[in-house]
Amino acid sequence: MEIMAVKQILSNCKILYGNDSVTIGLRREEIIRDYFHGEIPEVTVLDSPGNYDLYRSYLEGQSLFAVKTAVVMENPFFIKRPPKDKKEENEFNGFINILKELTPDTLAIFTVDGALDKRTKASKTLLSVCGSEECSLLAPREGASVIARMLMDCGKRVEPEARAYMEEVIGSWETISRPFLQTECDKIVLMAGNRTGISKKLLEYACLLYTSPSPR
């Protein structure tokens, strides 16, 4: 009987990818804060393209001293292109083993601008050990639904007329980011106070979603 391998996703290895750089930056900080439970670790950001020796020196070197550290690798070179030769392929496999052996005091975060091609061997292998999260801009047609859910999570209910108003206004924008919608949601909740229902009048009174902003 064949035994199927089970993926072991590491709690201290994350991949953030997508075309919303603002959200990637915010999520990166949130992940670091949550992983270390509010403690402030030493954070190292390694710019693209990087190399295995550089990555290894920070991941392994910091672990030896048992210092709480977060190593952020931006647009790692192996994500965008396949190994040049067998030597580089072996280096990649060795790098994956380093990730698997990280101590809990070290958090590894990869950030990728744009789409992550999950068909490549490098992406598949990395995703087999690291948790991933897409951080992309929203289509205008999604905006009203997203902010309505945010408001619902805050205990608010969007009235039908207000929902139609949001769909009309947000639908005219070119691009939308989740952080911007979250900011708008926070403002609406503040203006609503103890009121559960969110009306069109309240949105207009708060000067929220009143005019189309520049693309975000």
Identify what each model region corresponds to.
Residues 7-14, 21-209:
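Non-catalytic interfacial helical region
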